[in-house]
Amino acid sequence: MTRYSVQSVDPTKTASARGAYLRTSFKNTYEVAGAIRGWNLQKALAYLDQVTDHKRAIPFRKHAGSIGRTGQGKEFGVTKARWPVKSIKFVQDLLQNAQANAETKGLDKETLVISHIQVNQAPKQRRRTYRAHGRINAYQSSPSHIELILSEPAEEIAKAKETSLAHISSRQRGRIAAQKRISA
């Protein structure tokens, strides 16, 4: 069994998937993961489909150097956004894998939430390119490791009403008693 950077609280209510040494840009995949972290699974898959069709965009926050601006970033409060199709394809495949794992465990796919998604850098794949005057430059790719965990949200328990009052001084107690006598 592979290790994840986060231990799930209740393994019976979570499903996970991971991909290692995926040949897709680390920076683009990092931004895609950040855009859907904490989202409902169905909502995230629909959003990624819309980004693939260029109807919405992925906001670029950290790795945003030399990136053009687009109005589609306004919904996220940013000006720099892109449509990284290859990274989206890898993330969609992992989400569908985790969804299949969740269905195998008997979890409800309508309520699943992306509770953890993390992108790490994999070792660079090195090639070379030949330049003028006999020089050679490095020509590297930046692959990624991706891991994600889907979980059913915890049921919210209603907070019990407070039965005891805060500390009351003797003067306040006397005043409350006097008001009760007057109203009775």
From Swiss-Prot:
GO molecular function: structural constituent of ribosome
The keyword Transmembrane is annotated on this UniProt entry: no
Keyword match Glycosyltransferase: no
Gene3D superfamilies per UniProt: Ribosomal protein L22/L17
GO cellular component terms attached to this protein's record: cytosolic large ribosomal subunit
Assigned keywords, A-Z: Ribonucleoprotein, Ribosomal protein
Gene Ontology BP term (one): cytoplasmic translation
Domain of life: Eukaryota
Protein family per UniProt: Belongs to the universal ribosomal protein uL22 family.
Name used for this protein in its record: Large ribosomal subunit protein uL22
Taxonomic classification: Eukaryota, Fungi, Dikarya, Ascomycota, Saccharomycotina
